[in-house]
Regions:
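Intrinsic-disorder-associated, low-complexity terminal segments enriched in Asp/Asn/His/Tyr and depleted
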Residues: 4, 8, 16, 21, ...
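Residue-identity detector for glycine
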Residues: 6-9, 36, 49
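Intrinsic low-complexity, disordered N-terminal segments enriched in polar/charged/small residues
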Residues: 9-14, 30-33
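Gly/Gly-Pro- and Ser/Thr-rich, intrinsically disordered tail segments characteristic of DNA damage-repair
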Residues: 18, 38-281, 291, 329, ...
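DNA-contacting surface of Y-family translesion DNA polymerases
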Residues: 54, 61, 167, 230, ...
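Short, hydrophobic beta-strand segments
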Residues: 161-167, 354-357, 403-411
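Acidic, metal-coordinating catalytic segment for phosphate/diphosphate chemistry
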Residues: 361-450
Length: 450
């Protein structure tokens, strides 16, 4: 384990001087054999310093462990003891892994890996196609539990959330670990899902703490001890540092956060350029401290990897239409509208093209999103046809989101009628399944392929 130093850089043997308190009697605490000021009991961790520091924020980050895998296992208990790989779209060699069980991760498999590569690493793995409605249902159940503990709950994604405990110093003067333990147990009891929880003075520290605590762990990093905690991390663990960036910096001799902490910003800029300022701030533990309870998601999107490379625009438009309908349906389910439509095409040479268009008004209607998506597709596909390139992946996203009620106040009559028709279609699909209502253009394409 990497060394955690105190706020003044003192060595670990002096750690007892830094501790403000212990959560449990000393006899109950198992000190880590490695150096540092981490104390563990049943996978609880506390990182704290001796200096009296006023806590400006107390944020919890709740991260559900192997969420997509565990939701599938709840509905299919026979998958409990197998190396399980959940795929979002295709289950053949052209698809990608959406989530891997912890057993499968031991073979080096991770989210986003092509299925063909995952099969080579773990031939005995079982593949399962996930269900977005099931994920959404489980995520909403978790959110309901979290709202019992804090009035400010921000779902960063389906499987992670931030909770604001600012101003609770008198209620919880020593530590928030007991609260985190109660949250973890309540989530497990209510939903059957495990989670890890990180606590920190800002969002970044809280998230990195939950990452360090996985699986089913708890970690608290006190204000004033951010740098000591971060010093033990690799740069690749930091937000905004992807694999390619980490590899490029490693070639320059930068692999660990403590190296960045010790460099002045000018010297760092000479090595990595314009990223120096932001990286330096993160390495010193600076991060956002505010949460907005009603923060909207950034986008709603769907994409699919095709079973074969396609060059027929009618086939591609049919697939795009279905993806658009799925996106529009999700917007309506979540009470959202969006203004910006983005098309994504990946060609058979793996070149990715995106096109976007911003509408005058936000919408959640299939037809309005489809009209923009089709125009974008025709622009992008003309270029692909000119280069004689097939398409292996197609996707659609809607961004620039807002609350649907705000857009309905001055809706024209013809648009209101389209909304009523859409609501009727939604009811049929809810009762009989999405494919119960299929446009004629899609059916014609299917008949032609027979």
């Amino acid at each position: 384990m990497r060394r955690h130093r105190g706020p003044d850089g003192a060595e670990p043997e002096k750690r007892d001087r830094w501790r403000r308190h212990e959560l449990w009697p000393a006899s109950a605490i198992e000190r880590e054999e490695a150096e540092g000021v981490e104390f563990r009991l049943a996978h609880h961790r506390l990182v704290s310093g001796a200096r009296s520091v006023k806590i400006s924020a107390r944020i919890l980050h709740v991260d559900l462990d192997a969420f997509f895998v565990e939701v599938c296992r709840q509905r299919h208990p026979e998958l409990r003891d197998v190396e399980l790989l959940v795929v979002g779209g295709r289950r053949d060699q052209r698809g990608v892994v959406q989530s891997a069980s912890y057993g499968a991760r031991r073979f080096g498999i991770h989210a986003g890996m092509p299925i063909a590569q995952a099969v080579r690493l773990c031939p005995q793995a079982t593949f399962f196609q996930g269900s977005f409605p099931h994920y959404r249902e489980a995520s909403q159940a978790v959110r309901a539990v979290l709202q019992r503990f804090s009035p400010v709950v921000v779902m960063a994604s389906l499987d992670e959330a931030y909770l604001d405990f600012g101003g609770t110093d008198r209620l919880y003067p020593v530590s928030l670990l007991p609260v985190a333990e109660s949250i973890r147990d309540a989530v497990k009891e209510t939903t059957g899902l495990d989670c890890s929880i990180g606590i920190g003075p800002n969002r970044m520290i809280a998230k990195l703490a939950s990452d360090s605590a996985k699986p089913r762990g708890l970690m608290e990093v006190r204000a004033g001890w951010e740098q000591g905690f971060l010093a033990g991390l690799a740069l690749s663990a930091m937000p905004g540092v992807g694999p390619k960036t980490a590899a490029r910096w490693a070639e320059l001799g930068l692999t660990d956060v403590w190296q960045v902490q010790q460099m002045d910003e000018t010297a760092l800029a000479r090595r990595i350029g314009a990223d120096a300022r932001g990286l330096k701030r993160r390495a010193l533990g600076h991060g956002g401290t505010t949460l907005h309870a009603e923060r909207l998601p950034k986008s709603v999107s769907r994409e699919t990897t095709l079973s074969r490379d396609l060059r027929d625009p009618e086939e591609l438009e049919a697939i795009l239409f279905l993806l658009t309908a799925r996106v529009a349906g999700q917007l309506r389910d979540e009470g959202l509208v969006g203004r910006t439509v983005t098309l994504k095409l990946r060609h058979d040479d793996f070149r990715t093209v995106t096109r976007r268009h911003t509408l005058e008004l936000g919408t959640d209607l299939d037809g309005e999103i489809w009209q923009a998506a089709r125009a974008l597709f025709q622009q992008a596909f003309d270029g692909a046809r000119a280069r004689n390139r097939g398409v292996r992946l197609i996707g659609i996203a809607v961004t620039n989101l807002g609350v649907a009620a705000e857009a309905d106040l001055f809706e024209p009559e013809d648009r209101r009628r389209r909304r009523e028709l859409t609501a009727a279609v939604d009811k049929v699909r809810e009762k009989y399944g999405f494919s119960a209502v299929t446009p004629g253009a899609i059916l014609r394409t299917r008949r032609r392929d027979r």
